[in-house]
Amino acid sequence: MSNIKIKIENLYKIFGPDAKGLTSAVKDGLDKDELLAKHNHVLGLDNINIDIEEQSIQVIMGLSGSGKSTLIRHINRLIEPTEGVVMVDNQDVTKLNKSELLEFRRNRTGMVFQRFGLFPHQNIVDNVQLGLSIKGVDKSESNQTAMFWIDKVGLNGFEYKFPNQLSGGMQQRVGL
């Protein structure tokens, strides 16, 4: 029996002031070019349905502008869906209130942006510890946790280097 970690059902994202009003037109066959030409709205996602099993690896691939980032940003609700359901561990992320969403983002999801923001004046350990110190974790515990994850992503020996001393891929792993 499969264990679904993330389930996305009937997800639509239309960018524009009357997005909700135009969803039914898109469902009835209005394509993205017509939506833009006639209504000056942009179709970001069109009826996306995905099940992601726990402990699986998935790849979201597509051309530039095809909606990959838009889709991913719906999982942690950095973007609000026009319509649809986004479930993580059987919890509908689209229904979380502000405090529940904050808790969800802090403790259950993470995201590494393509242009991540490492602090250039801090070494790798300090960059990794930053989130923990903001959460109030004591220095000893945050250092131990940081060293564990630095090891886990294969950056042993680089703990006290600065971001500009690492390759882009290594910096990406620090961002993880």
Task: Tell me the role of every PLM-derived stretch.
Residues 97, 105, 125, 151, ...:
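Signature (C-motif/LSGGQ) region and adjacent switch/coupling loops
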Residues 6, 43-45, 104:
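Conserved structural motif at the start of ABC-family nucleotide-binding domains
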Residues 121-129:
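Short coil-to-helix segment of the ABC ATPase nucleotide-binding domain corresponding to the Q-loop/switch region
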Residues 162-166, 170:
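Conserved ABC ATPase signature
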Residues 25-34, 89-92, 129, 133-136, ...:
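Conserved ABC ATPase "signature" region
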Residues 82-85, 141:
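Conserved coupling/switch loops of ABC nucleotide-binding domains, chiefly the family-specific signature
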Residues 76:
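Helix-to-loop junction immediately C-terminal to a conserved catalytic motif
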Residues 35-40, 94-110, 134, 139:
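ABC ATPase NBD coupling module
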